[in-house]
Swiss-Prot record:
It comes from Oryza sativa subsp. japonica. Belongs to the HSF family. Class A subfamily. One of its GO terms (molecular function) is sequence-specific DNA binding. This is Putative heat stress transcription factor A-6a. The gene is HSFA6A. Disulfide bonds: none annotated. InterPro entries: HSF_DNA-bd, WH-like_DNA-bd_sf, WH_DNA-bd_sf.
Amino acid sequence: MDYSTVKQEEVEVVVLDGEEEAAAAAAPVPLPAAMGVGAAVAPFLVKTFEMVEDPATDAVVSWGGAARNSFVVWDPHAFAAGLLPLHFKHANFSSFLRQLNTYGFRKVSADRWEFANEDFLGGQRHLLANIRRRRRGAGTGSTTPRAVNCGGGGGEGEVERLRRDKEALARELARLRRQQQEARAQLLDMERRVRGTERRQEQCTEFLARALRSPDVLDNIARRHAAAVERKKRRMLAAAADDDGLTFEALALAAAADTSHSTGGAVTTDMIWYELLGEEQAEIDIEVDQLVASASAAADTASEAEPWEEMGEEEVQELVQQIDCLASPSS
């Protein structure tokens, strides 16, 4: 009896895009006899399994966890530049991803390149024969459950991640817009203050220029100030102690009415001076109070130097009448 030895050769087909992918489906690679007679698997699956199973490439691609039911491409650049050219005739990572999708692999993590297939398990090479390639143009009804789930979980996770990123960017944009509005409001307020300061400086400059051209203005102001001090001293001596007296500004305006015979230019200059002094009225009142207090102290000293006993009865009577006149409302 003659015995013949039949050697089963492995036919290698490199799967690429387009027509070359169809050639891979037409020429599957038979697996070793240990995996079962007649079992065949696509070269793409065999080479992918070998890359993942090789411990020397764990830094680039390896099994995803202790269960070894998924694999992770840790470094896509090194994977495309170093491993793909060794097993395929291309170095295109996108083409590799399309091939995974064709054979029913799904992306199981939105944060890393992790893929899984229920028949692609570590140490179980014989299960590769159960993975079938999806046909182009096949209807939804003829698609296997693995093909339906292909990329489903990963796609939803990617959409959710993009939605969260969009919401975070929208919140950041709203925060930046609020900061811009606040900065713009502060800038407008600062510009308003600067314009007010410049306007006051111009008014002061104009007033000083007019005062130099008409020296009588300063004399009028000095006389009115002295008159205000004198009137306040009289009120204190009369012991009226009321708070409804005229302010310095009112006294100045009254004095301006008394000197209405002056020229029109001088009156205009005086009005500018009153406007400038209006904001410093409190300081002027304090100064007036100090002058009145000094005058009162001097008057007290003089009264102590001249006792009432030395005054005659007629002089005392005349002084009382003067005080009554000053204290009366008609004064």
